């Protein structure tokens, strides 16, 4: 082998899954590489080393934790298989994804890292015990379980909420075909603190507790959550003319079933109203109130310790939106929802650290007009 020539990873290889096995695959010429190699730490260290072009001598020096002969042999095998190739090789058609990702190496690296997961076979009790339960015991000996409760910065108690707001307190659609049909079913319900409370009770409030293995007592809510982690927080943005509550910004305090007022300027209140109503179909309607959903990542990441634990958080958020939509349709409310919230604006106004808690979505209820999105 030429130890001066520079080599690089053939980035058209992708990690694919079949059942519980992982394998490397290149779609251009339908080349697949053995699944077993993806469990080899040296393989991935070599892969990382050759993400940028380098000579074989340089790579051996970089991987000094390994025996040089072992590294050289592994590199030679990866070169022979086509996983590593000489820089400037032009004798094949490159995967378009390589070009698309050439300007975002961090995204490509993240994809690689998040693909190196030692998947748990939940059909195998021994695998669950070894990779899940025993690992949680180890983590608990070193770390504290993140709390399910959070009190927002710069907030103070404002409105204690009733644990039950009966649906019969409002006009409501008692026919599923009316509530969920194509025809609009607006009802003359006045927007009020009671309506806000009812929606919170179905989407955010604690209903019970559950004991989980190792991590102890956790919350139950009207929405399911992966591992009972419930990472989604609610910030309530209230406009004018909402009965029983002052215009302003509030954080829903789950522990005390309470709205805590957050002290912000009127210009910041307007900024949050606009941020939650970012889509054209929402901007064109009178603002009533909105739930801005944020996520405290640590809650889920403590339990699901892999780079793609964001999927569990998105499942949770989807369930929350579903419950909000169901309740709003039954009440005949005019609403909009969006996952296009301008995070930087929300995080700035609410003084959130985006590495700990970030804006995810918004659910907006409009005043007076009779239209559902």
Curated annotation (Swiss-Prot):
GO terms for molecular function: oxidoreductase activity. Keywords: Cytoplasm. It holds the Pfam family Nitroreductase. It is found in: Cytoplasm. One of its GO terms (cellular component) is cytoplasm. InterPro entries: Bacteriocin_Proc_Enz, Nitroreductase, Nitroreductase-like, SagB-type_dehydrogenase. To E.coli McbC which is involved in the processing of microcin B17 (MCCB17). NCBIfam families: antibiot_sagB. The actions of the proteins TfxB, TfxD and TfxF are implicated in the processing of the inactive trifolitoxin (TfxA) precursor into the active peptide. This is Trifolitoxin-processing protein TfxB. It comes from Rhizobium leguminosarum bv. trifolii. The lineage of its organism: Bacteria, Pseudomonadati, Pseudomonadota, Alphaproteobacteria, Hyphomicrobiales. The gene is tfxB.
């Amino acid at each position: 082998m030429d130890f001066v020539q520079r080599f690089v990873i053939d980035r058209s290889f992708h990690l694919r899954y079949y059942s519980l096995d992982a394998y490397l695959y290149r779609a251009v010429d339908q080349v697949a590489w053995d699944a077993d190699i993806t469990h080899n730490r040296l393989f991935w260290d070599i892969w990382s080393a050759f993400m940028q072009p380098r000579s074989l001598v340089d790579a051996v020096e970089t991987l000094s934790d390994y025996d040089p002969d072992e590294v050289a042999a592994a590199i030679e095998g990866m070169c022979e298989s086509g996983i590593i190739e000489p820089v400037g090789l032009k004798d094949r058609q490159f995967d378009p994804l390589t070009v698309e990702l050439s300007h975002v190496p961090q995204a490509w690296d993240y994809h690689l890292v998040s693909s190196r997961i030692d998947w748990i076979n939940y059909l195998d009790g021994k695998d669950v015990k070894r990779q899940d339960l025993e690992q949680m015991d180890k983590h608990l000996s070193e770390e504290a379980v993140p709390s399910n409760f959070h009190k927002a910065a710069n907030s103070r108690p404002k409105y204690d909420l009733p644990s039950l707001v009966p649906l019969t307190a409002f006009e409501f659609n008692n026919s599923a075909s009316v509530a969920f049909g194509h025809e609009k079913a607006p009802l003359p319900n006045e927007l009020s603190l009671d309506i806000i409370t009812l929606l919170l009770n179905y989407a955010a409030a604690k209903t019970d507790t559950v004991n989980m293995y190792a991590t102890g007592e956790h919350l139950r809510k009207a929405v399911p959550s992966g591992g009972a982690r419930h990472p989604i927080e609610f910030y309530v943005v209230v406009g004018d003319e909402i009965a029983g509550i002052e215009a302003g910004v509030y954080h829903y305090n789950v522990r005390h079933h309470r709205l805590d007022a957050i002290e912000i300027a009127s210009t910041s209140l307007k900024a949050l109203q606009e941020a939650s109503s970012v889509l054209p179909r929402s901007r064109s309607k009178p603002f009533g109130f909105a739930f801005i959903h944020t996520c405290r990542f640590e809650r889920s990441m403590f339990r699901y310790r892999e780079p793609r634990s964001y999927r569990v958080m998105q499942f949770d958020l989807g369930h929350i939106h579903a419950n909000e939509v169901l309740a709003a349709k039954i009440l005949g409310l005019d609403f909009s929802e969006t996952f296009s919230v301008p995070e930087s604006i929300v995080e700035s106004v609410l003084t959130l650290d985006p590495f700990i808690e970030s804006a995810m979505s918004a659910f907006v209820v409009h005043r007076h007009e009779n239209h559902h999105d």
